[in-house]
Amino acid sequence: MRAQPTASHYVNGRYIDDEQGAPLPVIYPATGETIAMLRSATPNVLELAIEAARAAQPAWARLKPVERGRILRRAADILRARNADLARIETLDTGKAIQETLVADAPSAADCLEYFGGAVAAYNGEAVDLGGPFAYTRREALGVCVGIGAWNYPIQIAGWKSAPALAMGNAMVFKPSENTPLSALALAEIYSEAGLPDGLFNVVQGYGDVGAGLVGHDVVAKVSVTGSVPTGRKVLSLAGSKMKHATMELGGKSPLIVFDDADIENAIGGAMLGNFYSTGQICSNGTRVFVQSGIHDRFVERLVERTKKIRIGNPLDPETQMGPLVSKAQHEKVVGYIGIGKQDGAVLACGGNVPSLQGFDGGFFVEPTVFTGVTDTMRIAREEIFGPVMSVLKFDGEDEVIDRANDTEFGLAAGVFTRDLPRAHRVIAELQAGTCWINAYNLTPVEIPFGGFKQSGIGRENSLAALALYSQLKSIYVETGDVASPY
């Protein structure tokens, strides 16, 4: 199986390569085989990309917002038209089941381009009456922005970062994760086909040194990163040393709280979505599932029953519900945490094994796993695993569960399942998390902001909040009379 792109990088409207770059193999997670070989960006490639962005950005910013938006909406239409091909690329790159990538990856990127392509035309400054004189504000582009993606939703993240940046008149240099480099190249081609001028969206591949080279470059005005907390800290430190704007969408260990009066099937469905979708590799996952004591045993019994029915296998098979983890390293990490959970005394209710699948012996598969009897101090309840490992914790009262839910360095997301809506709103108001759901989980429409509190990030993706973060505000005072001066 092969998925070799035309070249490794997309700069100034064309594919380029540099044979001096370090090899960057693309591994199909279902089999462990190499399906493409790319090259990491050299300093020369980085300079070409940043210079292309710098040169193209001013003319782009001078266009009317509606003109910029028209190109983004055209790109959204192309994304939707090619969804089947893009879903296959994403499945080969990430290992996620094709039934997921068909509905959750390129479609989300398309929604994002469409939303910002329309919203930017009405995103204006304001006028202020000062009783004779007046003032007004302008939202202006920052310049060259850098996007650094993660491997769980490659094309979605590329869309989430590039759409608001481009809509506001910026240029972007985007570095995908070295694990999943393919779909960002496809997005770059689509932008060009939609009429985006050359140099405004460039893709460069590479490891951490390439990201550091982009973040530290003097021309770059803003950095947006999706990744782990340790990665975010490094990037923020480097960006802050040069006073660059920064958006950090980082990790989590989010609480999902199920009260006694919840619809138990809906709550279980939310918990499964919040732990097993994308093989558990979602930053906002509700991996600490707090279940009130009155329904705890019944919840666990039904949860285990439903979890055992999840179909694991060939991710290109439309009937498969869960594919492999993204890489050997991630597989070793997740399996290691399952072992830690057992050692720490958690009860393995189901899963926890590496399945034997005919034809996929080299794949990075693991069964969806449920631990019960988990305490707040166990490592599986405190550290981000980023795999299909759910911890179920029992609680008695509302105040208790709020305190326990907030006892974490993270604050990306939280969820509450209950039929008592006043209680739902009351609890959500007390939870220290940036993105919350009531009687749902992990739904992230582009119209609402997405991001976290505490160590889970800075800034927001999506919604009008993202346009604000890809722009800078200029204030203009206009005098209509004489200048009052004592000199």
Curated annotation (Swiss-Prot):
- One Gene Ontology molecular-function label: metal ion binding
EC number(s) per entry: 1.2.1.8
Q: Which cofactor does it need?
A: K(+)
Binding sites annotated in the UniProt record for K(+) 1? 27, 93
One Pfam match, by short name? Aldedh
Binding positions (NAD(+)):
149-151, 175-178, 228-231, 251, 283, 384
Q: Which reaction does it catalyse?
A: betaine aldehyde + NAD(+) + H2O = glycine betaine + NADH + 2 H(+)
UniProt keywords (A-Z) are: Metal-binding, NAD, NADP, Oxidation, Oxidoreductase, Potassium
Q: GO annotations under biological process? A: glycine betaine biosynthetic process from choline
Could you name the active-site residues?
161, 249, 283, 461
- Specify the signal sequence span: none
**Top EC class per UniProt?**
oxidoreductase
Q: Residues that bind K(+) 2, according to the entry?
A: 454, 457
Q: In this entry, which stretches build a coiled coil?
A: none
Which top-level group of life is the source organism from?
A: Bacteria
- How the cofactor binds, per note? Binds 2 potassium ions per subunit.
Q: Does the keyword Ribonucleoprotein apply?
A: no
| Pathway listed | Amine and polyamine biosynthesis; betaine biosynthesis via choline pathway; betaine from betaine aldehyde: step 1/1
Question: What is this protein for, i.e. what is its function?
Answer: Involved in the biosynthesis of the osmoprotectant glycine betaine. Catalyzes the irreversible oxidation of betaine aldehyde to the corresponding acid.
Family per UniProt? Belongs to the aldehyde dehydrogenase family.
Q: How does it assemble?
A: Dimer of dimers.
What this protein is called in its record is: Betaine aldehyde dehydrogenase
Gene assigned in the entry = betB
